[in-house]
Amino acid sequence: LDIPYTGGNPQCLSYCYDKSLVRGIAKEIGIPVPQAFFVNPMDSTFDVTIDFPVLVKPNFGDSSFGITRNSVANSAEELLQAITDIRKKFGYEKPILVEELLTGKDLTLGIIGTPPGSFQTLPVSEEDYSMLPPELPRICGYEAKWQPDSPYWSIKSVRAELPPDTEKALVEWSVKLSERLECRDYTRFDWRLDAAGIPRLLEVNPNPGWCWDGHLAKMAAMGGMSYSDMLGAIIKSAEERILMEYGANIRMKEINMRQEIAV
């Protein structure tokens, strides 16, 4: 349709919504990820190659669909039940990713702009689980985002307090991933610290929610940016990018025309 738009292109979205693919790309460029293994569609047997507890999630998708308190498994029996639950809800033809359950700080970092061009990083935010009943696993899944009557709705986002080296790594790795995956205009990166305090990539979110109470808006507010200014910055990034792409296309057409005339 040739209609300009903000955010990632179809290729970027298809890459980022494949969690195992993003993991592979991250590892390839030296970015830490949780230990994990893959369960193929219709597999009835598989090797458990990591220690419990684990987090079971659909390999494809976004918005935490399929990730609930029941996605945390502390035994083989609970793992099989979690896999069965996902297959019943999302289909037996869908692959499943099983990751080690990290319990360090649960972090997210936002970028507005398009690296390596003009961009700005937003303050790192942390999920505050202090109001969550102690018996529930500390994860920010579907219940925290879509079910107001859930105890997970009590989770708050606060500005993260991190060692300078850790924050520096988060920014550098997020920018590196943004470039490699060709994310554009606005992106959010989810991380979690391991037992040694090392950030490990959970997910890359191209075109993350920009609603007024979403993570991106909260991080922008932490950095002193109003909601309208955040939206304006996203649109400005897209305008600058589209103008550059348009100019490059015009120049290429001019070159092709000259070559045709010369022939």
Q: Which role fits each region the language model picked out?
A:
Residues L1:
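N-terminal glycine-rich "phosphate-gripper" loop used for MgATP/nucleotide binding
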Residues P4-Y5, V33, V54, Y227:
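Hydrophobic beta-strand scaffold residues
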Residues G8-Q11:
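Short beta->alpha connector loops at strand-helix junctions that form conserved
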Residues L13-L97, T103-K105, P115-P116:
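Active-site nucleotide/adenylate-binding loops and adjacent lid/helix of ATP-dependent enzymes
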Residues K27-I31, E161-V263:
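ATP-dependent carboxylate activation and anion-phosphoryl transfer catalytic cores
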Residues A76-D165, A195-R200:
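Phosphate-binding site of ATP-dependent enzymes
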